[in-house]
Amino acid sequence: MTKADIIEGVYEKVGFSKKESAEIVELVFDTLKETLERGDKIKISGFGNFQVRQKKARVGRNPQTGKEIEISARRVLTFRPSQVLKSALNGEAPPEDHAEIDAREEAAADAAEARGEDFDEEGMEDMEG
């Protein structure tokens, strides 16, 4: 799907003109981009969370030569889908209280981040019942 496809969808479903639809879509993407550039998290209920994470500089290895190389510190964008989206992708009924499950996942992810760890969602499935 492209940005043009999204604009077309807004045009067809909402009834705005194509110009208005394009302006709305551009505004949404600009807002998302600015939020992420500030380092703020984006939480979209029933869809997922976008977050910018800081990666530390580290020593890596060139796979072709085996030579060690410095990989500089950088910011990376991560996306964690909600339980509702994961269920939809797997053809399952959405969880009864997806907001509660999303909140538990978010709390677990925040706790892992505070400890300097990556969040592993696989363990969360046991908590979902």
From Swiss-Prot:
Pfam families the UniProt entry points to: Bac_DNA_binding
Self-association state and partner proteins as the record states: Heterodimer of an alpha and a beta chain.
Lineage: Bacteria, Pseudomonadati, Myxococcota, Myxococcia, Myxococcales
InterPro entries xrefs: Hist_DNA-bd, Histone-like_DNA-bd_CS, IHF-like_DNA-bd_dom_sf, IHF_alpha
Encoding gene per record: ihfA
Official protein name in the record: Integration host factor subunit alpha
Organism from which the protein derives: Myxococcus xanthus (strain DK1622)
Annotated GO CC locations: cytosol
Single GO term (MF): structural constituent of chromatin
Alphabetical keyword list: DNA recombination, DNA-binding, Transcription, Transcription regulation, Translation regulation
SMART domains recorded: BHL
Source superkingdom: Bacteria
Composition-biased stretches (Acidic residues): 118-129
Keyword field contains DNA-binding: yes
Chain segments carrying region Disordered: 87-129
Family as reported in the entry's similarity comment: Belongs to the bacterial histone-like protein family.
Record PANTHER family: DNA-BINDING PROTEIN HU, INTEGRATION HOST FACTOR SUBUNIT ALPHA
A GO biological-process term: DNA recombination
Role: This protein is one of the two subunits of integration host factor, a specific DNA-binding protein that functions in genetic recombination as well as in transcriptional and translational control.
Compositionally biased tracts (Basic and acidic residues): 95-117
